[in-house]
Structure formats: structure tokens, C-alpha cells
Amino acid sequence: MTADELAAAVGAAAAHELDSALDRIKHCQGQLTDEQVWRRSAPGLNSIGNLILHLCGNLRQWVVAGVGGAPDARNRPAEFAERGPIPKEELLRRLEAVVEQAKGVLAGVDTRQLTEVRRIQGFDVTGVAAIFDSVPHFRGHTQEIVHMTRLQLGDAYHFAWAPATPEQGAPADKQRDEG
């Protein structure tokens, strides 16, 4: 594998992870009302809406601007100060747009971009470090959104996936007939 092939593989894997996490966020959002998206379990805690704004800001700053070279105009405090209700459809539109921008950067990333040190949010990092900071950060907050959705919905929560075969881990009484 050449260095360019490795750079392309890193970009493709990161883009796939963003798509997977975005699908989970969309799955959760589809089960919630605008009010639930902006609900805070305590005054000092974030809502799902705040987390989505935060994901937009972080991904834009670290990947789109930091790795891709776009201008960085992030206002991090505003991500957490917002009380909404920005409609959930608008939040998803914003998030999808930033994910697409990031995937565009990741699709064209080269070895120079991966190894070059740049300053992002006060940190001196390589491009690969920026990607491996931002993408797991995105997934972590995605899992937080899943958890917050499940807490609000309880037994009404619909899972995005459930095992159907023994290989996938389905209990014997829950296996689907494959015939």
C-alpha cells in the first residue's frame, strides 16, 4: 500500500464512521419532538439540540477548516448557550451539511494533509490527529444522543438494529425465520 492509498483509506474510514454516526442521530431525531430535542435533564446539562450544534462546530473546525483549510469562524460558547427551539429538521440539515463538507475533505485528503502540523483550537496537531480527535468525538456525542433519547422514550424507543441470527447474537427465542 502506498502512502497515498493509506491516506485515501484513512479518509474513507473516517467518512464511513461519520455516516454511521449521522444515521444514528437521524434515527433518534425521528423519534423525538422539537421539545424533546431541546429538553435538558438539569439546568447545567446540554440538550440534544446543543449537542448537535456542538458537533457541527467541532467537525467544521477540526476537519473542514483544520484539515481542509476552510476559514474557521466557530463560536463554541454559542453552541451550548442556545436554548432553541431551532426545529429538529433544521438541526439535521445543518449537521448533514457539515458532514458532507467533512466527507469532501476526507475524500481528497493526501499524505501532506495528514502529516502536516497545524493549530486547531489552540492545539498543534497533525491532520491525522485532527481526524482521529474529531471523528471519535462525533461518535461519542452520538452515543450520548442515543442514551438521552432512550432516557426520554423508555420502552417506546425503537432500536435501529437488532440481532436476527445466532451469528449476530440473537437469543434463540428471538431469531427470525430465514426460510
For every predicted segment, state its role.
Residues 1, 32, 46, 83-86, ...:
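Short coil/turn linker and secondary-structure boundary residues
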Residues 1-16, 81-84, 90:
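Short, charged, low-complexity loops and linkers
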Residues 2, 72, 87-89, 115-116, ...:
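Serine/threonine-rich low-complexity intrinsically disordered regions
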Residues 11, 15-19, 23-29, 34-78, ...:
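Short, contiguous alpha-helical
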Residues 82-119, 126-140, 144:
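Acidic/histidine-rich alpha-helical segments that form the ligand environment
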